[in-house]
Amino acid sequence: MAEMFDNTIKKDRVLLAAVDTGSYDVELSLDELEELTETAGGEVIARVTQKRPSFDSGTCIGSGRLEEMAEICRNENIDRIVFDCELTATQIRNIEDVCGVFTIDRTMLILDIFAQRATTREGRLQVEIAQNKYRLPRLAGMGTNMSRLGGGIGTRGPGESKLETDKRHIRTR
């Protein structure tokens, strides 16, 4: 008897996060971010905002609110967090360490939408270039093992870290 497979694409369960510094309408911006998330194929499960005079340099959002986000991620089976501001590599790593969930910012979400929609070879290459330019300074800490030793074909010899290999690969592309 033939087995039946579920061919439906599972939508990512997404948590939206924003910091309200008072410089713009956070709810309006989150509404737009929710529409972008749905365009990218995600399902927004929850929103978290925090009023702060400025962004936290380590996590963008305060530690108490970050713990609350981690709890939401566990309870709601969140697959991805999307922040409504630009995040540094350190902020991404710190957020992922606390919440245990893949984290991106608004710009990466928009680039992902372009990547999904690009149909021509030239369009796909342009999107790949844009993604690589955006990811290059954010590579530090991405992935689970960045201290891998090289030494194989195509590396710079023993001791080349995964980070260095990835950066060289992106520059070459």
Task: Name each model-derived stretch.
Residues 109-173:
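Extended, highly charged alpha-helical segments
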